[in-house]
Amino acid sequence: HPIKHAGEAAFLDLISGGRLEFGLGSGAYQREFDRMRPGLLQTDGYKYMQEMLPAVLALWKGDYAHDGEYWNFPTSTSVPKPLQANPRIWVAARSPVTYDYAVANNANIMCWPFTRPHAEAELYKRQLDEAIAKHGGSADPIFALMRHTAVYENQKDRDEAINAITRVLGQFENLYRNLDDVKNGFPKEIPLQELEGREQYEPTMLEQNLMFGSPETVIEKIKIYEHLGVDEFIYYASMGLSHAGQKRSLKLF
C-alpha cells in the first residue's frame, strides 16, 4: 500500500541519516502474486507500481488524497518524512513501457539481462534511449545493470561458481514457471537439461554472459558495459556460493 511504503521508506531514511535509495519493481513470480494479492496476474503488476510511485512521492511532501484505479484513500501523509528532500528513485525495467514510465517520472533505471548475451543489455539501452528521446531528450537517468558475479583465479573456484549458479537457475525456473514445488521456502531445482532453450544455461555460455572470470577478464567485461553507457554495475551475489567463496570473489572484484 502506498501509505505503508511511504512511511516505512521515510523511517529508513531517518534512521540511516539520509541514505535511502527507493527502488520499485513490478514483481517477478506469479507465486508471489497468488499469495500477496490473489487474482492479480504477474503481467499486470506494473500497473500497480506505476500508480504507487507518484502517490508515495506525494505522501512524502505532505497531505495527499488519492483516487486511483487500484488504491483510494482520504487525505493522508507520511510520518515521518524523509530526511532527504528528494531521495534517489529507482525503477526496475526490462520493457519499453517501463522505461518510458521511469523517464517520465524522473526515476533511475535498474536492469537485469538474466543469463542472456550482451545483446540483451544493448536492447535495454536502446529502450532507454528511445524513452529519453520521446520525452524531449533532456532526461539523464542513472542506468544501472545487474549481473550474477563470481571472480576467481583457479579451476576449483570456477567450478564452484558454475555449480552454484546452475543450482540457483534450476530453482529460478521452478518459480518462473509457477510449478508450486516449494518446501519450507526452498523451490525444487529443475534439471536444466530438461528445459527448452537450455543453451543459455550451458557452463561456457554462463561464464561468457555473466560477470564470471578472472579479475582481468571481469575488468574487460565491465569496460564493455561502460562503453555501452552503463553508469553503475550491480554485483549480484545471491547465487548459492559458500560464504568463503563469496568473500574470495568480493575481494578479487
Locations of regions flagged by a protein language model:
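Flexible, glycine-rich active-site loops centered on histidine and acidic residues
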Residues: 1-66, 109-110, 115-117, 163-164, ...
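Aromatic/hydrophobic pocket-lining residues that form the small-molecule binding cavity
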Residues: 5, 49, 121, 218, ...
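Conserved, mostly hydrophobic/aromatic
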Residues: 12, 22, 56, 89, ...
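Glycine-rich, proline-tolerant flexible connector loops at the mouths of alpha/beta enzymes
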Residues: 33, 112-118, 236-249
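An alpha-helical appendage that flanks or caps ligand/catalytic pockets
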Residues: 42-78, 119-230
